[in-house]
């Protein structure tokens, strides 16, 4: 298949054209509205990042390229550089060391490489002799090269430039949506295999391996550490272990796991139960599935993401009353911030080349910040929804002893049915998460479209 017939050839070309336009607009706006060194930016040099090692060891830490580099190139290698100049083809400085210890070749498909002027070097210290002109802004992890490049600290990750670029990362073009759909399709296959393993009595380690095998990925190729939690461990929001003990008696699985395709990440969570689970928890799972679907149906342009979070807290307050986990009424529980004890996280976040993508609290490209409400400081997204914006929707409901036990002898103790809560601690919690793109009139669910029966 030639580059011109590859499915990504046209959309990737348009993606690069769009990025060039964004960067040129950023430079023009900054030069007009800023003072100091930032007003003299003429081009941008992006560094993929440095290779790290564990302290006192020569073993390398798994590398993750800088997000603004990954936005341009699907290359996850350290010491790569991209130079963007107004009106010219971007230059990709491909650093390939002469090395017999490790594989250093970079497999760049034709449909990708043809968008760049490619300059191959054997070491990053050869870079300065190939850079011409002044006013170079540097984005990424600092290196010793900065001195030889003659860049001032004011041109290192200039805030005005980052504000503009971070804000625009929320909006995805067709190439980006193609990668996100592919990443979701892979993740859905992995989740299906994980659920099947769980239903057969698999333990956390076996479920984790079933996911990796179905997706045909290595652990360090995951966009984040897979959360594979059985029973009470599902109340630990970012549970990181994979227990190898028997899973035969487990009743609840919460798995939060994604995939990465050409740098773009999916972030999908499913909760499953086995026969014998607490009937009330089974009811809770059904109602949380419905809540997640309801939230997706509310997505449309020109509403604020915070509204979705507020709706979620109200729905959880109603669930607490309906399931008789709490007493009083939903309005009272909401006023007294009881739902936050059962869902202490936000209802989602922006998604792209980073799982928790940048710019979630920005009001505009100048860097003005919209803080989350005081009652929900963990909310990662406060943006107004616009067409082509991609984020997660992930309501959760957990029985977390660390949050609930202080209430047992506190001023609000009478609100809780402690007998029920004690019974439900062993079930852990529920989280349901899909990846969503805002359309002109509603939403595309990038995840559910790949599930059988959806």
Q: Where are the regions a protein language model picked out?
A:
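Active-site neighborhoods and metal-handling regions in enzymes and metal-associated proteins
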Residues: 1-454
């Amino acid at each position: 298949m030639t580059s011109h017939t590859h499915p990504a050839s046209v959309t990737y070309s348009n993606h690069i054209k769009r990025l060039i336009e964004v960067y040129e607009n950023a430079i023009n706006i900054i030069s007009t509205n800023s003072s100091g060194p930032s007003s003299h930016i003429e081009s941008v040099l992006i560094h993929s990042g440095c290779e790290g090692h564990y302290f006192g060891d020569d073993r390398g830490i798994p590398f993750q390229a800088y997000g603004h580099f990954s936005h341009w190139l699907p290359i996850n290698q350290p010491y790569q550089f991209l130079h963007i100049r107004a009106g010219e083809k971007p230059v990709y400085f491909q650093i390939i060391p002469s090395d017999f210890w490790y594989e250093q070749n970079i497999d760049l498909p034709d449909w990708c490489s043809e968008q760049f002027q490619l300059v191959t070097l054997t070491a990053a210290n050869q870079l300065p002799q190939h850079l011409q002109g002044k006013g170079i802004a540097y984005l990424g992890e600092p290196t010793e090269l900065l001195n030889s490049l003659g860049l001032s600290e004011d041109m290192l990750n200039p805030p005005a430039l980052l504000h503009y670029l971070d804000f625009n990362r929320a909006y995805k073009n067709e190439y980006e949506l193609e990668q996100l759909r592919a990443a979701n399709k892979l993740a859905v296959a992995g989740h299906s295999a994980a659920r099947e393993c769980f239903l057969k009595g698999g333990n956390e380690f076996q479920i984790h391996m079933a996911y990796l095998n179905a997706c045909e990925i290595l652990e360090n190729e995951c966009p984040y550490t897979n959360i594979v939690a059985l029973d009470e461990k599902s109340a630990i929001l970012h549970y990181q272990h994979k227990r190898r003990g028997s899973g035969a008696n487990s009743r609840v699985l919460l798995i939060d796991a994604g995939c990465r395709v050409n740098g773009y990440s999916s972030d999908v969570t499913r909760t499953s139960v086995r026969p014998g689970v607490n009937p009330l928890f089974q009811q809770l799972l059904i109602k949380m599935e419905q809540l997640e679907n309801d939230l997706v149906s509310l997505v449309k342009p020109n509403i604020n993401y915070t509204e979705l979070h507020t709706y979620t807290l109200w729905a959880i307050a109603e669930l607490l009353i309906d399931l008789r986990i709490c007493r009083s009424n939903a309005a009272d529980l909401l006023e007294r911030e009881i739902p936050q004890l059962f869902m202490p996280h936000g209802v989602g976040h922006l998604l792209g080349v980073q799982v928790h993508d940048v710019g979630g609290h920005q009001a505009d490209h100048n860097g003005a910040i919209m803080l989350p409400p005081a009652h929900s400081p963990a909310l990662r997204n406060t943006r107004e929804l616009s067409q082509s914006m991609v984020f997660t929707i992930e309501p959760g409901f957990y029985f977390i002893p660390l949050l609930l036990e202080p209430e047992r002898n506190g001023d609000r103790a009478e609100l809780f049915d402690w007998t029920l809560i004690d019974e439900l601690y062993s079930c852990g919690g529920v989280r349901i998460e899909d990846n969503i793109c805002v359309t002109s009139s509603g939403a595309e669910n990038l995840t559910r479209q790949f599930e059988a029966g959806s």
